[in-house]
């Protein structure tokens, strides 16, 4: 039974109902419908913290989905799971892949900046200020790109950029 039929969350149920209606009225191929079902089930599992199940659904959606824009969101969500699991190198890889398909994903750029900033803080704790500065500089570049795409967002990042004199 698809996950969307067993989920008890009201918002997920509402999303599933609306998505099913749209899939019936918008012309789509059976492959597109199947890819979306896996994507939707992946989001549902992810929201419940069932990351292994979410990844299985996302990988299956990737196998079926051909549209680069839609694939970018699948890749982004896979990156989120790896970030949550502390697998930052894998997460960065998936965020990069998402951005290759859709360069207008400020949330991917923000998450990449957060990972770089975290690595900079780790380097400081290890006493390596040179490496820390390199990570902070990289974080700044990603945040600047995210802010350029959505100027009203990422206020904390904007403040950090100003405080550290990295804002242009």
From Swiss-Prot:
User: Where is the protein localized?
Assistant: Plastid, Chloroplast thylakoid membrane
Q: Which InterPro entries match?
A: PSI_Ycf3_assembly, TPR-like_helical_dom_sf, TPR_rpt, Ycf3/AcsC/BcsC/TPR_MFPF
TPR repeats: which residues? 35-68, 72-105, 120-153
Entry keywords, A to Z: Chloroplast, Membrane, Photosynthesis, Plastid, Repeat, Thylakoid, TPR repeat
Q: How does it sit in the membrane?
A: Peripheral membrane protein
Disulphide connectivity of cysteines: none
Per the record, the GO terms for biological process are: photosynthesis
Q: Name one GO cellular component term.
A: chloroplast thylakoid membrane
Q: Which residues cross the membrane?
A: none
Function summary = Essential for the assembly of the photosystem I (PSI) complex. May act as a chaperone-like factor to guide the assembly of the PSI subunits.
- Family per similarity comment: Belongs to the Ycf3 family.
Tell me the protein's name: Photosystem I assembly protein Ycf3
Q: What is the lineage of its organism?
A: Eukaryota, Viridiplantae, Streptophyta, Embryophyta, Tracheophyta
In the UniProt record, what gene is named as encoding this protein? ycf3
């Amino acid at each position: 039974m698809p996950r969307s039929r067993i989920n008890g969350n009201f918002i997920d149920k509402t999303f599933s109902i609306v998505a099913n209606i749209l899939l019936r009225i918008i012309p789509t191929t059976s492959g597109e419908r199947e890819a979306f079902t896996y994507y939707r089930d992946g989001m549902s599992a992810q929201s419940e913290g069932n990351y292994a199940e979410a990844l299985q659904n996302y990988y299956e959606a990737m196998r079926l989905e051909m549209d680069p824009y839609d694939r970018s969101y699948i890749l982004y969500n896979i990156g989120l799971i790896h970030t949550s699991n502390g697998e930052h190198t894998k997460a960065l890889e998936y965020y990069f892949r998402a951005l290759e398909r859709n360069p207008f994903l400020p949330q991917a750029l923000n998450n990449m900046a957060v990972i770089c900033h975290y690595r900079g803080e780790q380097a400081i704790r290890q006493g390596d200020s040179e490496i820390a500065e390199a990570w902070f500089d990289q974080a700044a570049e990603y945040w600047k790109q995210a802010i350029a795409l959505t100027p009203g967002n990422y206020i904390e990042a904007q403040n950090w950029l100003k405080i550290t004199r990295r804002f242009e």
